[in-house]
């Protein structure tokens, strides 16, 4: 039986035991453009450089001609059938930089706790998983692609990673003893690194109502890896009173239904009921649902777990999540006994805020305009009143009979000489001792000079 046949058989066995399979997505293959610094594979005749201090296993599936190659101190190149390297002169391809080597990207950048790097075998249209459950849970079967090279960081080690089984390099590990031997080998050290611990245990989820994921302790590292491309901060939800379900890193818009279940409840059957009976209706188009068992937040009741149903709106229509949540509550009221549901409650986010940033900007501009108009209307009377008060204070501050002169540095007029009061401009001729008539006026600043003239 080939590798693909073994994988398909294993997935069928997982379906019979209600185990969820998680597939590792990224790889460290030579022929993948995303693994190189310039987002393209090395050009023909170009130089190739691997970081000297990084351990890495690289699968090469094609033939390549290079002019120079710098290999890591501890690593391996796995050559597929027909693959190899040949020496060539420096290439002159237009897309290649002049003499710049193609550098293999850091192989330690992939983390086990990053939800972006996993794909679930239970993916279906309209179905999603909360962030903590996108990473392998303790009852999941983990598959690393048999036809690709990979390298995984196991995290800081504060929370050991435990899953049901691990399939890698054509082997399936279900016992800690076998996995420990593999991790200590050179092949294991090239593919798994970091202080974190990895263990397996054949713990089947035999409960039809489902099992808790078990990633609560690792959720801080899961959220940190998820939000790293966003600077470590959650994007603002586009609704009022946003919700944050258990296992989710950021707030979302929609609704959450919590079910108190009995022994007859079947998680897979109920998830299929939502997908087939409700999400197929036109009024619920664009909604996505996540159904899982979570620890009960309030321990006032006997049951320590409950079923969490998360409804998220991704389309332009709003209010669909709330309508579906109320429909699920009505379905429980009518068919709860047959479904094994004892009680149901719901929470719903508030109204959507479409274009909230633009609305906030427009509101700020409008407030600034109103404030400016108010200043223009109120300021002139206040300024006029303040001017009169200042003028009166200025007049009162000058005592009667005080000298009004000042020293003028240009004309050197002493301040002790009181300047005459200015006279009204007069163009009436003034008679002189002789018969000559002159038209003039007295300039108080030059009164002394004119008198001498």
From Swiss-Prot:
Detected in proximal tubules in the kidney cortex (at protein level). Long isoforms are highly expressed in small intestine, colon and kidney (renal proximal tubule epithelial cells). Shorter isoforms are detected at lower levels in testis, thymus and peripheral blood leukocytes. Residues 202-254 form the VWFC domain. GO terms for cellular component: apical plasma membrane; brush border membrane; clathrin-coated pit; endocytic vesicle; endosome membrane; extracellular exosome; extracellular space; membrane. Glycans are attached at residue 35. Changing residue 234 to F: In IGS2; loss of interaction with CUBN; strongly reduced CUBN expression at the cell surface. InterPro entries: AMN (IPR026112). Residues 1-19 form the signal peptide. It comes from the Eukaryota. Keywords: Cell membrane, Coated pit, Developmental protein, Disease variant, Disulfide bond, Endosome, Glycoprotein, Membrane, Protein transport, Secreted, Signal, Transmembrane, Transmembrane helix, Transport. PANTHER family: AMNIONLESS, PROTEIN AMNIONLESS. The complex formed by AMN and CUBN is composed of a 400 Angstrom long stem and a globular crown region. The stem region is probably formed by AMN and the CUBN N-terminal region, including the EGF-like domains. The crown is probably formed by the CUBN CUB domains. This is Protein amnionless. It comes from Homo sapiens (Human). The gene is AMN.
């Amino acid at each position: 039986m080939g590798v693909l046949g073994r994988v398909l058989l294993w997935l069928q066995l997982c379906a019979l035991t209600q185990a969820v399979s998680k597939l590792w997505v990224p790889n460290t293959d030579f022929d993948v453009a995303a693994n190189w610094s310039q987002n393209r594979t090395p050009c023909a005749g170009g130089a190739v450089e691997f970081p000297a201090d990084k351990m890495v296993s690289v699968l090469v599936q094609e033939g390549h001609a290079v002019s120079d190659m710098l290999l890591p101190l501890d690593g391996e190149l796995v050559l597929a059938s027909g693959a190899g390297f040949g020496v060539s002169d420096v290439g002159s391809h237009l897309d290649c930089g002049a003499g710049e080597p193609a550098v293999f990207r850091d192989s330690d950048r992939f983390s086990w706790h990053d939800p972006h790097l996993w794909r679930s075998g239970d993916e279906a249209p309209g179905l999603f998983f909360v962030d903590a459950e996108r990473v392998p849970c303790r009852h999941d079967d983990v598959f690393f692609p048999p036809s690709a090279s990979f390298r995984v960081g196991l995290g800081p080690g504060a929370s050991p990673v435990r899953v049901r089984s691990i399939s890698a390099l054509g082997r399936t590990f279900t016992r800690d003893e076998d996995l420990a031997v593999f991790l200590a080998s050179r092949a294991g050290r090239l593919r798994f690194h970091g202080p974190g611990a990895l263990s397996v245990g054949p713990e089947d989820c035999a409960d039809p109502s489902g099992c808790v994921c078990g990633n609560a302790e690792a959720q801080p590292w899961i959220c940190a890896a998820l939000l790293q491309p966003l600077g470590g901060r959650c994007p603002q939800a586009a609704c009022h009173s946003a919700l944050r379900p258990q296992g989710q890193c950021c707030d979302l818009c929609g609704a959450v239904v919590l079910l108190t279940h009995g022994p007859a409840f079947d998680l897979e059957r109920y998830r299929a009921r939502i997908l087939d009976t409700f999400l197929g209706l036109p009024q619920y188009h664009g909604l996505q649902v996540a159904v899982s068992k979570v620890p009960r937040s309030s321990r006032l009741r006997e049951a320590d777990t409950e079923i969490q149903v998360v409804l998220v709106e991704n389309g332009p229509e709003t209010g669909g999540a709330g309508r579906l949540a109320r429909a699920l509550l009505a379905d429980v009221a009518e068919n709860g006994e047959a479904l094994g549901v004892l009680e149901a409650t719901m929470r719903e986010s508030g109204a959507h805020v479409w274009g909230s940033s633009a609305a906030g900007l427009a509101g700020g501009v409008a407030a600034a305009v109103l404030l400016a108009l108010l200043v223009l209307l109120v300021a002139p009377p206040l300024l006029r009143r303040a001017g009169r008060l200042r003028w009166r204070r200025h007049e009162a501050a000058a005592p009667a009979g005080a000298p009004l002169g000042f020293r003028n540095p240009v004309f050197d007029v002493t301040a002790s000489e009181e300047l005459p009061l200015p006279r009204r401009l007069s163009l009436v001729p003034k008679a002189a001792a002789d018969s000559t008539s002159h038209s003039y006026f007295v300039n108080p600043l030059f009164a002394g000079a004119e008198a001498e003239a």
